[in-house]
C-alpha cells in the first residue's frame, strides 16, 4: 500500500551508484524519520535517522542529524572523505542535538538513531548508532549488516535469544546508543569493499522490524530497478502494517545500486581480524558506556 508514503526520490547518481530514498508516516501522527543523499564529486553520502522524543523532539533530532552530517561531510576535501570525516560529522550532529535540547526545555531527552554510508571509488565507509541498519547484498544474499545497538541484540550476542526472538520482543524498542542523549557518542566506522552489482539498503526499524529478515531478503531476489525496489520494499512493509491494525511505525529506506568495484578488497588476514573486531563490538566493548533509551 502507498497510503501515507511520499514519492520515491532519486537522491544521488554518479559513476559509482544510483540511490533512491522513500519515507512514510505509517500509522503514526507524525513522521520522526529523516533521510538525505548527496553527491560530492563521484562520491556519495547517504544518511537515515529515526528520531525519538515528544513535543516534536524526534522530528527535530533526526532533522538536525541528517542536516549536520551532510553539511560537515560536504566541507571535507573529496580525497579526505573517509573514517575521520564520518567521526567528525556524527560527533557534530550529536553535539548539535545535545545543545539544542539544553537550550529548548520541551525538547529535552530527544535523540535519534543514525546510519551513515559514504561510497568512494576506494571503499564503502559506514557507521551506525542505535537500531537503524545498513545491509550490503550481493546476488540476493546478505554480505554484510550492521549490528543493532539495542538491549535485545546484546542478548543475541550472548546467545540468550535468536535474532527473530529479538525482533518480536516487547523490549525491542530499547536502544543502548543514540545521538543527542550525551555530550559524546560512542561509534565505530567500518571500511568495507564492494563489487559491481552490489546493493546497499539503509533503513529504520519501521522497515526491518515488520517482517523477518529472510522474508525481507526475498524481496530483493528479483533484481528490480533501484526506484522500483525501494517502492516495493516500502509498500510491502506499509501494507503489512495496515493489515495488522494500522498503528505501525514510520518507515524509511534508501536503496543503492553499485555500478563498479571498489579498489579496496579484503585479504584473508583482514577478514579474520574483522570477524574478531565485530564480535567485540557486538558485545559492547567500545568505551564501556551504555545507556538505555526507550523509543515510542
Labelled PLM ranges:
Residues 1-296:
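PP2C/PPM-type serine/threonine phosphatase catalytic domain
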Amino acid at each position: 500500500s502507498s497510503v501515507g508514503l511520499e514519492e520515491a526520490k532519486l537522491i544521488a547518481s554518479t559513476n559509482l551508484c544510483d540511490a533512491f530514498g522513500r519515507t512514510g508516516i505509517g500509522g503514526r501522527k507524525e513522521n520522526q524519520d529523516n533521510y538525505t543523499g548527496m553527491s560530492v564529486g563521484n562520491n556519495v553520502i547517504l544518511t537515515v535517522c529515526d528520531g525519538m522524543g515528544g513535543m516534536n523532539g524526534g522530528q527535530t533530532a533526526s532533522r538536525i542529524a541528517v542536516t549536520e552530517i551532510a553539511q560537515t561531510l560536504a566541507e571535507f576535501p573529496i580525497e579526505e572523505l573517509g573514517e575521520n570525516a564520518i567521526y567528525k560529522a556524527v560527533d557534530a550532529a550529536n553535539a548539535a542535538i545535545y545543545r539544542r535540547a539544553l537550550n529548548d526545555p520541551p525538547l529535552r531527552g530527544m535523540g535519534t538513531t543514525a546510519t551513515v554510508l559514504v561510497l568512494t571509488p576506494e571503499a564503502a565507509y559506514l557507521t551506525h548508532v542505535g537500531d537503524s541498519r545498513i545491509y550490503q547484498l550481493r546476488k540476493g544474499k546478505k554480505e554484510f549488516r550492521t549490528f543493532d545497538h539495542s538491549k535485545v541484540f546484546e542478548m543475541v550476542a550472548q546467545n540468550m535469544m535468536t535474532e527473530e526472538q529479538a525482533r518480536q520482543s516487547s523490549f525491542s524498542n530499547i536502544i543502548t546508543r543514540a545521538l543527542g542523549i550525551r555530550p559524546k557518542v560512542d561509534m565505530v566506522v567500518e571500511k568495507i569493499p564492494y563489487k559491481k552489482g552490489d546493493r546497499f539498503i539503509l533503513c529504520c526499524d519501521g522497515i526491518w522490524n515488520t517482517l523477518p529478515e529472510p522474508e525481507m531478503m526475498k524481496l530483493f531476489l528479483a533484481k528490480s530497478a533501484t526506484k522500483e525496489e525501494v517502492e516495493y520494499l516500502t509498500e510491502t512493509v506499509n501494507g503489512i502494517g495496515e493489515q495488522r491494525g494500522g498503528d505501525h511505525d514510520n518507515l524509511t529506506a534508501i536503496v543503492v545500486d553499485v555500478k563498479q568495484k571498489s579498489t579496496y578488497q579484503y585479504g584473508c588476514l583482514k577478514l579474520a581480524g574483522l570477524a574478531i573486531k565485530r564480535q567485540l563490538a557486538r558485545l559492547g566493548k567500545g568505551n564501556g558506556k551504555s545507556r538505555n533509551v526507550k523509543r515510542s
